[in-house]
Amino acid sequence: MKHAFLLAALFGVAAVQANPTIETNGVLSNRDGRTLYTFDKDSTGKSNCSGGCAAAWPAFTVGNASLAGGDFSIVVRDDGTQQWAIQGKPLYFFAGDARPGDINGDNQGGVWHALRSAPKKAARNDSASSSAGYSYSY
């Protein structure tokens, strides 16, 4: 990853960190506070939301020189755009969310879910862990 940052610096491109989200009240959003959603009908690494679906549920697209890492990956949509994914699940916004922090799309049609973080349960282990201590539910 060090080399990617060096290349970005050489070419005058700002690299985006591997975690493109923030957490507010247990819900993950982009850095502008727009809630992120997953779609039950997506396959791992593949978006199945296009056309009218994509108008109501815009993809959380990847900016220039973005670097995936950890639970975050990048999937390529059928139209060629790149979309953020978490644990292989593509991420979306809901067009019906008017303000940062809105979660109006949660459980829409029983197949759209706001991305929530939940503390992992502690496991009995004598060794130290380097985990961030969060899992995601969708």
Please identify what each model-predicted range represents.
Residues 8-17:
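Hydrophobic h-region of N-terminal signal peptides that target proteins for export
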